[in-house]
Protein backbone atom coordinates (compact mmCIF):
# COMPACT_ATOMS: atom_id res chain seq x y z
CA UNK A 1 0.00 0.00 0.00
CA UNK A 2 2.92 2.29 0.55
CA UNK A 3 4.34 1.82 -2.94
CA UNK A 4 3.73 5.51 -3.71
CA UNK A 5 6.45 6.55 -1.33
CA UNK A 6 8.98 4.08 -2.75
CA UNK A 7 8.30 4.64 -6.48
CA UNK A 8 11.33 6.53 -7.89
CA UNK A 9 9.44 7.74 -11.01
CA UNK A 10 7.15 9.93 -8.91
CA UNK A 11 9.83 11.54 -6.83
CA UNK A 12 9.83 15.34 -7.06
CA UNK A 13 12.38 17.49 -5.32
CA UNK A 14 12.28 21.13 -4.34
CA UNK A 15 14.99 23.70 -5.10
CA UNK A 16 16.53 23.24 -1.66
CA UNK A 17 16.85 19.50 -2.16
CA UNK A 18 14.01 18.54 0.16
CA UNK A 19 11.38 16.07 -0.90
CA UNK A 20 7.84 17.17 -1.56
CA UNK A 21 6.37 14.49 0.68
CA UNK A 22 7.95 14.59 4.16
CA UNK A 23 8.70 11.39 6.01
CA UNK A 24 5.76 11.34 8.33
CA UNK A 25 5.17 8.29 10.46
CA UNK A 26 1.94 6.45 9.87
CA UNK A 27 1.18 6.37 13.55
CA UNK A 28 1.22 10.16 13.72
CA UNK A 29 -1.61 12.08 15.18
CA UNK A 30 -2.21 13.88 11.88
CA UNK A 31 -3.62 10.73 10.30
CA UNK A 32 -5.72 9.57 13.21
CA UNK A 33 -9.00 11.06 12.01
CA UNK A 34 -8.40 9.62 8.56
CA UNK A 35 -7.81 6.06 9.69
CA UNK A 36 -11.07 5.43 11.44
CA UNK A 37 -13.92 5.05 9.00
CA UNK A 38 -16.90 3.03 10.05
CA UNK A 39 -17.95 2.00 6.53
CA UNK A 40 -14.74 1.20 4.68
CA UNK A 41 -12.48 -0.30 7.31
CA UNK A 42 -8.79 0.00 7.96
CA UNK A 43 -7.67 -0.96 4.42
CA UNK A 44 -9.72 1.78 2.87
CA UNK A 45 -8.49 4.21 5.50
CA UNK A 46 -4.91 3.46 4.61
CA UNK A 47 -5.64 4.24 0.96
CA UNK A 48 -7.23 7.55 1.96
CA UNK A 49 -4.01 8.74 3.58
CA UNK A 50 -2.90 10.31 0.28
CA UNK A 51 -5.33 13.19 0.41
CA UNK A 52 -3.40 16.24 -0.75
CA UNK A 53 -0.12 14.82 -2.19
CA UNK A 54 -2.05 12.45 -4.49
CA UNK A 55 -3.25 15.40 -6.65
CA UNK A 56 -0.17 17.56 -6.38
CA UNK A 57 2.67 16.08 -8.50
CA UNK A 58 1.91 18.35 -11.44
CA UNK A 59 1.40 21.41 -9.24
CA UNK A 60 4.70 20.90 -7.46
CA UNK A 61 6.57 20.93 -10.77
CA UNK A 62 6.28 24.70 -10.75
CA UNK A 63 8.61 24.94 -7.77
CA UNK A 64 11.38 22.81 -9.28
CA UNK A 65 14.75 24.33 -10.11
CA UNK A 66 15.82 22.09 -13.00
CA UNK A 67 13.47 23.73 -15.57
CA UNK A 68 12.79 20.77 -17.80
CA UNK A 69 10.77 20.96 -21.04
CA UNK A 70 7.53 21.47 -19.09
CA UNK A 71 8.92 23.01 -15.92
CA UNK A 72 8.91 26.75 -15.31
CA UNK A 73 10.46 28.32 -12.27
CA UNK A 74 9.06 31.27 -10.40
CA UNK A 75 11.88 33.50 -11.64
CA UNK A 76 10.71 33.16 -15.24
CA UNK A 77 7.52 35.10 -14.53
CA UNK A 78 9.43 37.88 -12.79
CA UNK A 79 11.84 38.09 -15.73
CA UNK A 80 8.91 38.49 -18.13
CA UNK A 81 7.49 41.26 -15.95
CA UNK A 82 10.84 43.00 -15.88
CA UNK A 83 11.09 42.78 -19.66
CA UNK A 84 7.57 44.21 -20.07
CA UNK A 85 8.29 47.08 -17.70
CA UNK A 86 11.56 47.86 -19.47
CA UNK A 87 9.81 47.83 -22.87
CA UNK A 88 7.14 50.18 -21.55
CA UNK A 89 9.74 52.53 -20.13
CA UNK A 90 11.62 52.55 -23.44
CA UNK A 91 8.39 53.27 -25.34
CA UNK A 92 7.50 56.11 -22.97
CA UNK A 93 10.96 57.58 -23.30
CA UNK A 94 10.72 57.38 -27.09
CA UNK A 95 7.31 59.09 -27.07
CA UNK A 96 8.55 61.90 -24.85
CA UNK A 97 11.58 62.43 -27.08
CA UNK A 98 9.40 62.62 -30.20
CA UNK A 99 6.96 65.06 -28.52
CA UNK A 100 9.85 67.30 -27.42
CA UNK A 101 11.27 67.25 -30.95
CA UNK A 102 7.87 68.18 -32.43
CA UNK A 103 7.42 71.05 -29.97
CA UNK A 104 10.89 72.33 -30.75
CA UNK A 105 10.24 72.20 -34.51
CA UNK A 106 6.87 74.00 -34.13
CA UNK A 107 8.50 76.73 -32.02
CA UNK A 108 11.18 77.19 -34.66
CA UNK A 109 8.58 77.46 -37.44
CA UNK A 110 6.59 80.07 -35.47
CA UNK A 111 9.70 82.09 -34.79
CA UNK A 112 10.65 82.01 -38.47
CA UNK A 113 7.15 83.14 -39.52
CA UNK A 114 7.24 86.03 -37.05
CA UNK A 115 10.66 87.09 -38.30
CA UNK A 116 9.37 87.08 -41.87
CA UNK A 117 6.38 89.23 -40.89
CA UNK A 118 8.56 91.76 -39.11
CA UNK A 119 11.06 91.86 -41.97
CA UNK A 120 8.39 92.81 -44.57
CA UNK A 121 8.71 96.47 -45.53
CA UNK A 122 5.42 98.29 -46.11
CA UNK A 123 5.24 100.91 -48.87
CA UNK A 124 2.53 103.53 -49.40
CA UNK A 125 1.40 101.95 -52.67
CA UNK A 126 0.72 98.73 -50.77
CA UNK A 127 -1.61 100.60 -48.42
CA UNK A 128 -3.47 102.24 -51.28
CA UNK A 129 -3.75 99.00 -53.24
CA UNK A 130 -5.21 96.98 -50.36
CA UNK A 131 -7.43 99.67 -48.88
CA UNK A 132 -10.43 98.75 -51.05
CA UNK A 133 -10.31 95.08 -50.03
CA UNK A 134 -10.20 95.84 -46.29
CA UNK A 135 -6.67 94.46 -45.85
CA UNK A 136 -4.92 97.72 -45.23
CA UNK A 137 -1.44 97.65 -43.73
CA UNK A 138 -1.52 101.18 -42.36
CA UNK A 139 -3.87 103.39 -40.41
CA UNK A 140 -5.50 105.10 -43.42
CA UNK A 141 -8.01 102.38 -44.15
CA UNK A 142 -11.23 103.44 -45.81
CA UNK A 143 -14.40 102.61 -44.01
CA UNK A 144 -16.73 100.15 -45.66
CA UNK A 145 -19.94 101.34 -47.21
CA UNK A 146 -22.93 101.19 -44.91
CA UNK A 147 -25.59 98.79 -46.14
CA UNK A 148 -29.12 99.67 -45.05
CA UNK A 149 -31.84 97.08 -44.78
CA UNK A 150 -35.16 97.35 -46.54
CA UNK A 151 -36.96 98.37 -43.37
CA UNK A 152 -34.41 101.08 -42.60
CA UNK A 153 -34.51 102.58 -46.10
CA UNK A 154 -38.32 102.55 -46.02
CA UNK A 155 -38.41 104.43 -42.71
CA UNK A 156 -35.83 106.97 -43.89
CA UNK A 157 -37.64 107.51 -47.19
CA UNK A 158 -40.93 108.14 -45.40
CA UNK A 159 -39.26 110.63 -43.09
CA UNK A 160 -37.53 112.33 -46.01
CA UNK A 161 -40.86 112.61 -47.83
CA UNK A 162 -42.28 114.69 -44.98
CA UNK A 163 -39.14 116.41 -43.67
CA UNK A 164 -36.06 116.90 -45.79
CA UNK A 165 -34.19 118.41 -42.82
CA UNK A 166 -34.18 116.84 -39.39
CA UNK A 167 -33.71 118.35 -35.99
CA UNK A 168 -31.47 116.65 -33.45
CA UNK A 169 -34.39 115.39 -31.40
CA UNK A 170 -36.07 113.85 -34.43
CA UNK A 171 -32.78 112.31 -35.53
CA UNK A 172 -32.37 110.61 -32.15
CA UNK A 173 -35.92 109.22 -32.39
CA UNK A 174 -35.32 107.78 -35.85
CA UNK A 175 -31.96 106.34 -34.76
CA UNK A 176 -33.61 104.48 -31.87
CA UNK A 177 -36.45 103.25 -34.09
CA UNK A 178 -34.28 102.04 -37.00
CA UNK A 179 -31.27 100.78 -34.96
CA UNK A 180 -28.87 103.25 -36.58
CA UNK A 181 -26.55 105.95 -35.30
CA UNK A 182 -27.13 109.67 -35.65
CA UNK A 183 -24.13 109.97 -37.93
CA UNK A 184 -25.49 107.32 -40.30
CA UNK A 185 -28.85 109.06 -40.48
CA UNK A 186 -27.19 112.41 -41.08
CA UNK A 187 -25.07 111.03 -43.92
CA UNK A 188 -28.07 109.29 -45.48
CA UNK A 189 -30.11 112.49 -45.45
CA UNK A 190 -27.22 114.46 -46.97
CA UNK A 191 -26.87 111.97 -49.81
CA UNK A 192 -30.62 111.86 -50.31
CA UNK A 193 -30.80 115.66 -50.53
CA UNK A 194 -28.03 115.69 -53.14
CA UNK A 195 -29.96 113.17 -55.16
CA UNK A 196 -33.13 115.19 -54.76
CA UNK A 197 -31.32 118.35 -55.97
CA UNK A 198 -30.09 116.62 -59.09
CA UNK A 199 -33.58 115.36 -59.83
CA UNK A 200 -35.06 118.82 -59.25
CA UNK A 201 -32.42 120.43 -61.49
CA UNK A 202 -33.29 118.05 -64.29
CA UNK A 203 -36.99 118.79 -63.95
CA UNK A 204 -36.32 122.55 -63.80
CA UNK A 205 -34.25 122.53 -66.98
CA UNK A 206 -37.02 120.68 -68.74
CA UNK A 207 -39.82 122.89 -67.39
CA UNK A 208 -37.65 126.08 -66.94
CA UNK A 209 -37.91 128.92 -64.44
CA UNK A 210 -38.35 127.71 -60.85
CA UNK A 211 -35.21 125.57 -60.36
CA UNK A 212 -32.93 128.36 -59.11
CA UNK A 213 -35.36 129.49 -56.40
CA UNK A 214 -35.77 125.95 -55.03
CA UNK A 215 -31.99 125.46 -54.95
CA UNK A 216 -31.46 128.68 -52.99
CA UNK A 217 -34.10 127.66 -50.46
CA UNK A 218 -32.46 124.23 -50.00
CA UNK A 219 -29.02 125.77 -49.46
CA UNK A 220 -30.42 128.15 -46.86
CA UNK A 221 -32.03 125.30 -44.94
CA UNK A 222 -28.78 123.33 -44.94
CA UNK A 223 -26.89 126.29 -43.53
CA UNK A 224 -29.50 126.74 -40.81
CA UNK A 225 -29.21 123.04 -39.89
CA UNK A 226 -25.41 123.23 -39.65
CA UNK A 227 -25.52 126.31 -37.43
CA UNK A 228 -28.11 124.66 -35.19
CA UNK A 229 -25.91 121.58 -34.75
CA UNK A 230 -22.89 123.71 -33.89
CA UNK A 231 -24.86 125.60 -31.26
CA UNK A 232 -26.07 122.36 -29.66
CA UNK A 233 -22.51 121.00 -29.50
CA UNK A 234 -21.24 124.15 -27.81
From Swiss-Prot:
Superkingdom classification of source: Eukaryota
InterPro entries xrefs: Antp_homeobox, HD, HD_metazoa, Homeobox_Antennapedia_CS, Homeobox_CS, Homeodomain-like_sf
Basic and acidic residues bias: start-end ranges: 218-234
SUPFAM superfamilies, alphabetized: Homeodomain-like (SSF46689)
Gene Ontology CC terms, in alphabetical order: nucleus
A Pfam family assignment: Homeodomain
Location within or outside the cell: Nucleus
Keywords: Developmental protein, DNA-binding, Homeobox, Nucleus, Transcription, Transcription regulation
Main location: nucleus
Secretion signal span: none
An annotated Gene Ontology molecular function: RNA polymerase II cis-regulatory region sequence-specific DNA binding
An example Gene Ontology biological process: anterior/posterior pattern specification
UniProt short sequence motif Antp-type hexapeptide, positions renumbered to this chain: 122-127
Start-end of DNA-binding region: 141-200
RNA-binding as UniProt keyword: no
UniProt keyword annotation of Protease present: no
Record region (Disordered): 200-234
Stated role: Sequence-specific transcription factor which is part of a developmental regulatory system that provides cells with specific positional identities on the anterior-posterior axis.
Similarity section: Belongs to the Antp homeobox family.
Name of the featured protein: Homeobox protein Hox-C6
Organism field: Notophthalmus viridescens
Gene from which this protein is expressed: HOXC6
Amino acid sequence: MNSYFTNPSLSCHLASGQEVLPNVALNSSAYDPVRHFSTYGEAVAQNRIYSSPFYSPQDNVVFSSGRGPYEYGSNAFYQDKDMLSSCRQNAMGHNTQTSIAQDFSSDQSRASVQEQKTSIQIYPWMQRMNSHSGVGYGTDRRRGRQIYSRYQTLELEKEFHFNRYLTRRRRIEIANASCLTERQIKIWFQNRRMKWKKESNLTSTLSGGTGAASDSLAEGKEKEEETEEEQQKE
